[in-house]
C-alpha cells in the first residue's frame, strides 16, 4: 500500500561542549589557539550529532536511527552468527521504493565478519571500492561505518527520510571571568538540533548475535 506519514514534531535539543585553557596558552601569538579551539569544537559537535542521530532516545536529544521505539523497523534478531543469507534478508526485507537510494550503516567492528561472508557460489559478497573516495559495497549497496553505530546492529535503508532540524547557528562563547581566579579561560560551544525518522519503514534494522 501507499506509505503513510505520522506527524513528527522536531524539537530543539541542546548539544554543547566546553573546555578550559590557560591564559598563557591563549595569548601565545605563535599559535592561533582560538581558531584551533573553534575547529575542535566543530568536530566535537559533529561527533555529538552523529552519536545522537544514530542512538538518541528522543529524551532531551534527537531520536536515533537505531532507537528501539522511534528508529528504523526491526526486521529480525539473529540467534546465530551472521550469514550471507541474513544480509540478503535485510536487503530484500526493505520495500522496493526505498532500496533505490539505500545503504548500510554499521560499526567498524562488524566489518571483519562481514568481509568473510560468501554466497552459495563461494564468492565474497563484499565488493571493495576500486577508486579512491568510492565506498565499499555489499550486494551492490554502499557501506557506511560509524564508531557510534551499535556493535550489535546493522541498518539498511534510505536515510533521506531522517529529518534534521537545526534551530539557529552554532554559537561559540569565550568565558573570561568564570575561571579567571585559576588563570584559566573557558570556551563553550552550543547548538540546538533535533532529528527523527519520519518514515520508519524506510530503514530496516537487523540485530546481531554478539559474543
Predicted regions span which residues?
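Structured, hydrophobic secondary-structure cores that serve as assembly/anchoring elements
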Residues: 1-211
Amino acid at each position: 500500500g501507499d506509505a503513510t506519514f505520522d506527524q513528527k514534531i522536531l524539537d530543539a535539543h541542546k548539544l554543547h561542549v566546553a573546555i578550559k585553557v590557560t591564559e598563557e596558552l591563549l595569548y601565545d601569538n605563535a599559535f592561533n589557539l582560538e581558531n584551533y579551539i573553534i575547529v575542535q569544537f566543530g568536530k566535537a559537535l559533529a561527533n555529538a550529532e552523529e552519536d545522537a542521530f544514530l542512538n538518541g532516545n528522543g529524551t532531551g536529544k534527537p531520536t536515533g536511527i537505531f532507537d528501539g521505539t522511534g528508529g528504523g523497523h526491526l526486521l529480525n534478531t539473529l540467534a546465530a552468527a551472521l550469514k550471507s543469507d541474513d544480509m540478503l534478508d535485510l536487503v530484500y526485507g526493505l520495500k522496493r521504493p526505498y532500496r533505490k537510494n539505500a545503504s548500510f550503516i554499521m560499526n567498524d567492528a562488524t566489518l571483519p565478519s562481514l568481509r568473510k561472508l560468501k554466497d552459495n557460489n563461494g564468492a565474497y559478497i563484499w565488493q571493495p571500492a576500486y577508486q579512491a573516495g568510492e565506498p565499499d559495497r555489499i550486494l551492490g549497496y554502499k557501506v557506511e561505518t560509524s564508531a557510534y553505530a551499535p556493535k550489535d546492529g546493522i541498518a539498511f535503508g534510505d536515510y533521506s527520510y531522517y529529518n534534521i532540524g537545526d534551530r539557529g547557528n552554532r554559537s561559540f562563547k569565550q568565558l573570561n571571568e568564570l575561571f579567571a581566579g585559576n588563570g584559566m579561560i573557558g570556551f563553550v560551544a552550543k547548538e540546538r538540533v533535533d532529528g527523527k525518522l519520519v518514515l520508519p519503514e524506510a530503514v530496516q534494522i537487523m540485530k546481531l548475535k554478539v559474543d
